[in-house]
A protein has these predicted regions:
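Compact soluble domain cores
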Residues: 1-71
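Short, compact, well-ordered microdomains
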Residues: 60-104
Length: 104
């Protein structure tokens, strides 16, 4: 299992600050990371789904996932969505980053 709260995945400073000290937010982020690694990319459009599929098939490019932040976890977060992006599929080790759209 991927453990975001112990820095096994890069997180933006904003995501880290939002999740730090809140086990329930960290647990939700780990759930999102597990979905991302299982090819459940959340709420992305068909174009991004096709691009993700091509990236996996060709071992080239990046994978993006988008997960809406549940209202009970938002806690003042202005972004309603978390993005997870895995880059450099053609050059292992890959880099996975968790960020809010406003961090991009």
């Amino acid at each position: 299992m991927i453990d975001l709260c112990n820095a096994r995945v890069n997180a933006s400073a904003t995501v880290h600050g939002w999740a730090a000290g809140h086990d329930y937010r960290c647990a939700w982020l780990v759930e999102c990371l597990n979905r991302h690694t299982a090819d459940d990319w959340g709420d992305i459009d068909p174009h991004d789904q096709a691009a993700n599929t091509r990236a996996i098939t060709n071992s080239d490019g990046r994978i993006i996932s988008a997960y809406p932040v549940p209202a009970h976890l938002a806690g003042g977060n202005p972004d309603p969505t978390v993005w997870i992006i895995t880059d450099d599929l053609d050059q292992p080790p890959t880099t996975t980053t968790v960020l809010f759209p406003s961090d991009y």
